[in-house]
């Protein structure tokens, strides 16, 4: 592996952020010996509905969630870029700002199963490596075009600055932001599902009501 900075990329709408985002990111950080993990809220998600709260509020919730983990950083680059949040554009901007850094894009199996449908997926691999996170014992998709991409780029350990894919079993909580928004709308407790300070922020700002 290169001796330059190794930065993990954890992108998402984070609407709201919860422990299902945070725990896998921590395990990837340590397993791949990353220098830091960037949390990048999407400005305008391409493959899902628009977020229910403002980009600024989602960023503030992310900052609260990660403030006690020094290796976790909030990066607002997709908000700064504006427009649809295509990963390849984000990586191009990151690489331009930090040409000596190497980037590792976190992706769950559900997202990776549609990777061949992403805008310029080849460009993504030209700019970064990918870590596909999955539950222990759960296979990574190996059928069809996505399976071929995985097999063509898979390595046991990252040795280059881009173009490689590793897979990593992580603790994955059966938890979604959709379910959390439903709990919050119904007035159900969200204790032990998200950081306490994030829940407090949501209640104070009357979000997801």
UniProtKB/Swiss-Prot annotation:
Residue spans crossing the bilayer: none
Gene symbol of the encoding locus: nadD
Catalytic activity as recorded in UniProt: nicotinate beta-D-ribonucleotide + ATP + H(+) = deamido-NAD(+) + diphosphate
Family to which this protein belongs: Belongs to the NadD family.
One Pfam family matching this protein: CTP_transf_like
Family annotation (InterPro entries): Cyt_trans-like (IPR004821), NadD/NMNAT (IPR005248), Rossmann-like_a/b/a_fold (IPR014729)
Origin organism lineage: Bacteria, Pseudomonadati, Pseudomonadota, Gammaproteobacteria, Thiotrichales
GO terms (BP aspect): NAD biosynthetic process
Keyword Acetylation attached: no
Keyword Isomerase belongs to the record: no
Function: Catalyzes the reversible adenylation of nicotinate mononucleotide (NaMN) to nicotinic acid adenine dinucleotide (NaAD).
Superkingdom, natural source: Bacteria
Pathway(s) it belongs to: Cofactor biosynthesis; NAD(+) biosynthesis; deamido-NAD(+) from nicotinate D-ribonucleotide: step 1/1
CDD domains the UniProt entry points to: NMNAT
Listed GO MF terms: ATP binding; nicotinate-nucleotide adenylyltransferase activity
The name this protein goes by in its record: Probable nicotinate-nucleotide adenylyltransferase
Keyword annotations from UniProtKB, A to Z: ATP-binding, NAD, Nucleotide-binding, Nucleotidyltransferase, Pyridine nucleotide biosynthesis, Transferase
Organism: Hydrogenovibrio crunogenus (strain DSM 25203 / XCL-2)
UniProt-listed Enzyme Commission number(s): 2.7.7.18
């Amino acid at each position: 592996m290169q001796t330059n900075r190794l930065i993990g990329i954890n992108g998402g709408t984070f609407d709201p952020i919860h422990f299902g985002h945070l725990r896998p990111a921590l395990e990837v950080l340590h397993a791949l010996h990353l220098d830091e993990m960037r949390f990048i809220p999407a400005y305008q998600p391409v493959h899902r509905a628009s977020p229910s709260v403002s980009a600024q509020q989602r960023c503030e919730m992310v900052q609260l969630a990660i403030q006690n983990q020094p290796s976790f950083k909030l990066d607002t680059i997709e908000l700064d870029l504006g427009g649809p949040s295509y990963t390849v554009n984000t990586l191009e901007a990151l690489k331009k700002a930090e040409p000596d850094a190497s980037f590792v894009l976190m992706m769950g199996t559900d997202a990776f199963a549609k990777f061949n449908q992403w805008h310029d997926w080849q460009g993504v691999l030209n700019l970064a490596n990918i870590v596909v996170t999955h539950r222990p014992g759960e296979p990574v998709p190996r059928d069809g075009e996505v399976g071929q991409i995985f097999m063509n780029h898979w390595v046991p350990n990252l040795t280059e600055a881009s173009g490689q894919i590793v897979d990593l079993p992580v603790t994955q909580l059966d938890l979604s932001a959709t379910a959390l928004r439903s709990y919050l709308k119904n007035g159900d407790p969200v204790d032990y599902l998200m950081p306490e300070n994030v829940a407090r922020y949501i209640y104070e700002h009357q979000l997801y009501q």
